[in-house]
From Swiss-Prot:
Oligomer status and interactors: Monomer.
UniProt enzyme class: hydrolase
Lineage summary: Bacteria, Pseudomonadati, Pseudomonadota, Betaproteobacteria, Nitrosomonadales
Catalytic activity: an N-acyl-L-alpha-aminoacyl-tRNA + H2O = an N-acyl-L-amino acid + a tRNA + H(+)
GO BP term, pick one: rescue of stalled ribosome
Protein name (record): Peptidyl-tRNA hydrolase
Site description Stabilizes the basic form of H active site to accept a proton, residues in chain: D94
Gene source species: Methylobacillus flagellatus (strain ATCC 51484 / DSM 6875 / VKM B-1610 / KT)
Disulfide bonds: none
Alphabetical keyword list: Cytoplasm, Hydrolase, RNA-binding, tRNA-binding
Subcellular location: Cytoplasm
Site (Discriminates between blocked and unblocked aminoacyl-tRNA): N12
Length: 192
């Protein structure tokens, strides 16, 4: 099997961060759990909430509880334990460079200043993992980024982000089967 075996949603733990833009990856995993009747539970050895994707015994879900900037510790722990190579990992995260409502799938590349991605690459020893980038928009000023990602999106932005998450759920079968080109074509055509 060459499809995704580990879906990771990035975010920060705690009620004060629950509704912030930086938690878009957590929202995505929560939606995936709701749609597939899957569950995650706290697993200390994986530094996060983890569980199997319902109906797919070899596919895991993970929400690191290490805080965003140390997400790699959780990802590497689970990936090494279950012998999941980087190319079978999909990390779902907020993306400043995309507007709300956009979702883009890509493999590898830089971290674009996203410290969660930076730590995952460092802990795995490679950038060669898949990313699902959920657009949250940009505040327009670089100095406002930290405050922006740690605040909740406006109602219309949240609606657009929800649409992008819905669209990305439609390519789940392709992701599980390793049909990444097909998934990208379908997703990138759907969310413009």
């Amino acid at each position: 099997m060459n499809g995704i075996r580990l879906f990771v949603g990035l975010g920060n733990p705690g009620a004060q961060y629950e509704d912030t833009r930086h938690n878009a990856g957590f929202w995505w995993i929560d939606q995936l759990c709701a749609q597939t009747a899957s569950k995650t539970t706290l697993e200390a050895k994986f530094f996060g909430l983890s569980g199997r994707l319902n109906g797919h015994a070899d596919t895991w879900l993970l929400k690191p509880t290490t805080f965003m900037n140390a997400s790699g510790r959780a990802v590497a722990a689970l990936a090494r334990f279950y012998k999941i190579p980087a190319e079978q990992i999909l990390v779902v995260h907020d993306e400043l460079d995309l507007p709300p409502g956009a979702a883009r799938l890509k493999k590898g590349g830089g971290h674009s200043g996203h410290n969660g991605l930076k730590d995952i690459a460092a802990q795995l020893g490679t950038n060669d993992f898949w990313r699902l980038r959920l657009g949250i928009g940009h505040p327009g000023d670089r100095s406002a980024v930290v405050n922006y990602v740690l605040n909740a999106p406006l109602r219309d932005e949240m609606q657009q982000i929800a649409y992008a998450m819905d669209d990305s759920m439609l390519v789940l079968p392709q992701l599980l089967e390793g049909k990444f080109e097909e998934a990208m074509l379908k997703l990138h055509t759907k969310t413009k």
